[in-house]
């Protein structure tokens, strides 16, 4: 059966070669006589898998030596709840910049444990732009400043790293990590759920400057303590080994493809194809986001009549283009163009959009 182009926002498409390798190794892996999902996480075999995944991720993202890398169970929402526990002292404030749905989720999770303050909020303008960093209201003694690098639902993306002075900048990179070069030294911490650009759902990556791990934070169990997790190489308890293995295969694939420089080129080409179809449609398709902050990863757009949405989704599915229905919070159509989406997928979508407009415009 031919694989379709899957535009799902997450869990998202994975490289076919990675899936084929995982399929081939599922029953018996690496000559050990058992599946990768059956061997101990503390065995020499799996420890080698974990070490290779970290080494490859460090190479892919050019992670400085003074940053620790954690592989954690669960997703980004879990991390959002743990950030104040690990990095904010009791009674200390943390600043949040709200540029879409996931920024709102981040501050909601944090507010249970910290004085979570809104430094800037783009909701009044419909989340179509990102407030300039110079306009943010930052607390001088804030534990950190949190941003969402790319908003998957509203389709806005920070195209430059904001300057927050000496405050640690924390960022959710779940949907844009490894999509282009990133100067990690500008951040105190970045994190990402794997299920968009790094692998399958169920595992996340936290990259944190080591000196921040010395903060006392708030009383918490060892399992929620990032310093303890770093000391135990992300194996304080049994990790999601299958997910970790798949993440490692995906990261290695990205390196073999040419690394983040190559994916930046591909992602720019894919985004230009879809935005070109929107902007060249004479208003039949509409994207509401200011051009300077348009996401390259997630492109929401709207048709002239919402009654056409279901027809667009059904016809596109029949054409081998999957998961184009927009998020329920905003409606419309959404195309997610993560690293594993080939340029051919964006070409096919742009061609379908032109054909659909010719028939229904």
UniProtKB/Swiss-Prot annotation:
Name any cofactors this protein relies on: pyridoxal 5'-phosphate
**Which EC class, in a word?**
transferase
Molecular function in Gene Ontology: O-phospho-L-serine:2-oxoglutarate aminotransferase activity; pyridoxal phosphate binding
List of residues binding L-glutamate: 42
Coiled-coil portions: none
* Cellular localization per UniProt: Cytoplasm
Q: Where does pyridoxal 5'-phosphate bind?
A: 76-77, 102, 152, 172, 195, 237-238
Q: How is the cofactor bound?
A: Binds 1 pyridoxal phosphate per subunit.
What InterPro entries does its record include?
Aminotrans_V_dom, Aminotrans_V_PyrdxlP_BS, Pser_aminoTfrase, PyrdxlP-dep_Trfase, PyrdxlP-dep_Trfase_major, PyrdxlP-dep_Trfase_small
Q: Which residues carry this modification: N6-(pyridoxal phosphate)lysine?
A: 196
The entry assigns this protein to a family as follows: Belongs to the class-V pyridoxal-phosphate-dependent aminotransferase family. SerC subfamily.
- Outline the subunit composition: Homodimer.
**The name this protein goes by in its record:** Phosphoserine aminotransferase
Q: In which organism is this protein found?
A: Xanthomonas axonopodis pv. citri (strain 306)
